[in-house]
Amino acid sequence: MDSIRPIVVPLEPLTFPLRTAAKEYPQKTAIITPEAGGKEYSYEWLDEKSSAFAASLEDLGVKPRDHIALWLKNSMEYILSFYGILKAGGVVVPVSTHYGRREVLHQLRETEAKGLITSDSLYAPMGNLFSEIKRLRFIVCEGGEETSLGTPAFSSLLEGPKRLDRSIGIDPKETIAVLPFSSGTTGLPKGVMLTHFNLLSCLYQVVQVHEISANDIMINQLPFFHIYGMTVLMGTSVLAGATQVLASRFRPVDEFLSLFETYRPSLFFTVPLIVQEFCHHPKVPTMDWTRLRYVNAGGAILSPEVQERFTQITGVPVMVGYGLTESSPTTHVTPIGRIKKGSIGLPLSLTEDKIVDPETGTTLGPREVGELWVQGPQVMKGYYNDPEATAQTVVNGWLRTGDLAWKDEEGYVFIVDRLKEVIKCKGYQVAPAEIENILVSHPNIQDAAVVGEPHPEYGEVPIAYVVLKDRTTASSEAIIDYAAQGLAKYKRLTRVVFTETIPRSPSGKVLRRLLKSPPRKRSE
């Protein structure tokens, strides 16, 4: 089938697509920034300025393999910084703009970041990070010619005469390009080591299956700090030589929809929540959707009802993609013209999958429910400084997804539920252990467990089961407020259930399945 025919991925760094686009389409518009006055930037300009930025990073002391944190919203500055860090020989550490102080400090420490590229608006409330993060050598702030924080202005790093690209000549299969955070299957968030070859492979796989070309215009709203936005939106646009229209939010929905009227995109990669919002918005049925070839929804489960409803309203088919941070991220996509409702589709080119009995390790047959395992060039090198977690997650080259699934006779995969403990809220990962650690620090809480509760719009939301200490009291509202300090909004508890005990195994592991409803059965 065309969508999974073998492709050849060049042994090149992740900067290769930008260098190639700058040569093939030098004056073509690479980026349009409606939130910054509609400014446009060409591929030649982006390639040139990212090399200048790399040279400035070298002047700031960046050496090959240094970890540089990137904490910006979707913007020209984000894309330029991303490629500039790679050209300086560094490793990009994407940081969520939803994070609070506690989470930012944790990620900078865990990834051993030596530099931070951010904005005045994000950094100002943080206080002095240099005193908190001893390895941190520099902070660059975007926000004008002069910053109010005593840090180098972003614009000043673009003007020097020198150019640098250390990425040329590296070993792409061994050199780490990006170190995003993932909750993995259990526990606290940890760094995922994605090589240049991992990510470049995924770009080629996605461009092929979605038939993305230089003629395409994409509205890229999903955050680039998330692996989905970084690879499937930002990265594929550059590889294909397409034009990306940048947005950092989708609310108010009226304003976001106006981008579709102004720029007439041909492709739109998004999450189920936004597809659902569009289905309920009164403006959507009145709009002209004829230029939009299709919508791709990933990051969470898309209900067949929403998938069908959007197509009925707009005439635009909705494809479904599936993946994990640990697989760069995409492994499965529904092929164009061969969509099966409720399915995540077929494995991408060069990718294999199998359904495995999680208890016995036996490979299962069609319509038997087990854990989905995947194998391909996009599978991570491992978790940063965590060989034990790596060994548990990658077995003989096969990535254990932690998702329960089944395959039909044509190989289409259907997700049933999750083995792993991570909660998926609004397409983001929420690690129960992270919130639990905060809860048990409360002076009146003896024990706590966090699980996901189904939500009609967000997929899941975190709720907590709490055991109070003897002769103490605490209200649900007070506990929710306490746990919210320093956390992103999507990680915040929606309710608290008071209980006498938390079910645990003999080893002390929380038995979350006893706190949740049983998994759904697969459809025959």
Locations of the language-model features?
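Conserved AMP-binding/adenylate-forming core of the ANL superfamily
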Residues: 27-75, 79-83, 100-105, 155-156
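Conserved AMP-binding/adenylation subdomain of ANL enzymes
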Residues: 200-217, 227-266, 281
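Conserved pre-ATP/AMP-binding loop-to-beta segment of ANL
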Residues: 9, 26-29, 159-181, 188, ...
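Conserved ATP/PPi-binding loop(s) of AMP-dependent carboxylate-activating enzymes
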Residues: 346-350, 362-393, 430
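Conserved AMP-binding A3 loop
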Residues: 40-45, 177-201
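AMP-binding/adenylate-forming catalytic core of the ANL superfamily
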Residues: 99, 106, 116-118, 376, ...
